[in-house]
Amino acid sequence: MAGVQTAVSLREQGWSGAITLLGEEPHAPYDRPPLSKGVTTAAFDVDFAGLDVDLQLGRQATALSPARRTVTAADGEAIPYDHLVIATGAQPVTLPGAETAHALRTLDDAVALRPVLEAKHDIVIVGAGWIGAEFATAARQAGCAVTVVEAADRPLAGALPAEIGERMRGWYAEAGVDLRTGTTVAAVEPGAVVLVDGTRLPAGAVVVGVGARPATGWLAGSGVALDPGDRSVLADDRLRASVPQVYAVGDCASFPSARYGARLLIHHWDNALQGPRTAAVNLLGGDEPYDPVPYFWSEQFGRFVQYAGHRSPADTVLWRGDPDGPAWSVCWLRDGALTALLAVGRPRDLAQGRKLIERGARLDPAPAADPAVPLRAAAR
């Protein structure tokens, strides 16, 4: 996604030179979000020939030499560049001892899972995050028996506070999904998953959705600075990497946000769309900072969930609506200013809240907590 968008943005902004787009997968570029949102695929409607983009599929980058200004491919060819944009994305975190388990990151992953759904196997999903919930939804819709195993004590523990994640626990039960929290997988055996307490779960298939890490291992020894923790490319606020003429966008790169006073690593579609536009501007001589309001969406268990912004544990939580009902929102406030918003079945809240966050608007708590009052009307 991010690589394709970079190429398109460069042409839109007037770059007339050669563009080479390397893709590790052999398939034409496609949109990743539908892979978990129903295990479908969506090819990009991009005329690469018309854009005069040299699309090289099935070519993995294995090394970078900033001194020589070359990228080495898996076949050993050193490909020269004047400017380089790193958009290698992220790779799924694997489960030790579960080599036969399915991931859900690539087109091949989706193709491998389709017959599993068609056969209506008993499925065990490891991870109750966004991807786990979305695939559990698709599996239940296909008629599969589904068990979700989560090491934390609640769904979405890494993304949302306890009081919100707990509200989502009931969604699993309503959908007929057996959610097991506070436990981990000890072994994956033919036809079964064994938990650490000895419980055996029937499993015709196992799907692992416990997160992803930036795909930056190929940059070892290149001099490109990586975050010591998450191994993301440490881009600056113009999306420049630490070596000359190199930029980084999408899931593989983190950047400093002046808006939030933190370095952000965003593994979501909207970031892979917006970041390349800024990188293209700056690569062509512009000076545009990148400081978006993060946004993503998820469809799970019959609910449309949207999130915008970036919260911190110190932010004040403000509820809009009944969280036991079909539609509600949560606002996070910092010194009265809206910093983030989660909307369940309330897309207008999200649309208005995103604009309020962008302009740094402060909210009056009383009307903001009233779901009958438009969120924008609560702005001071």
Spans of model-derived segments:
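Beta1-alpha1 glycine-rich phosphate/pyrophosphate-binding loop at the start
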Residues: 1-55, 136-160, 352
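Rossmann-like dinucleotide-binding cores of NAD(P)H-dependent redox enzymes
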Residues: 39, 122, 130-186, 292-297
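A conserved short coil-to-beta-strand element within the FAD-binding core of flavoproteins
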Residues: 57-68, 93, 181-191
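Conserved beta-strand-loop-beta-strand element in the redox core of flavoprotein oxidoreductases
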Residues: 64-79, 189-200
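Glycine-rich dinucleotide-binding loop and its adjacent helix/turn
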Residues: 86-142
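FAD-site-proximal beta/loop scaffold in flavoenzymes
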Residues: 99-121, 192-194, 200-278
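Mid-to-C-terminal Rossmann-like scaffold of FAD/NAD(P)H-dependent oxidoreductases
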Residues: 252-349
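Cysteine/selenocysteine-centered motifs that mediate thiol-based redox chemistry or coordinate metal-sulfur cofactors
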Residues: 363-380
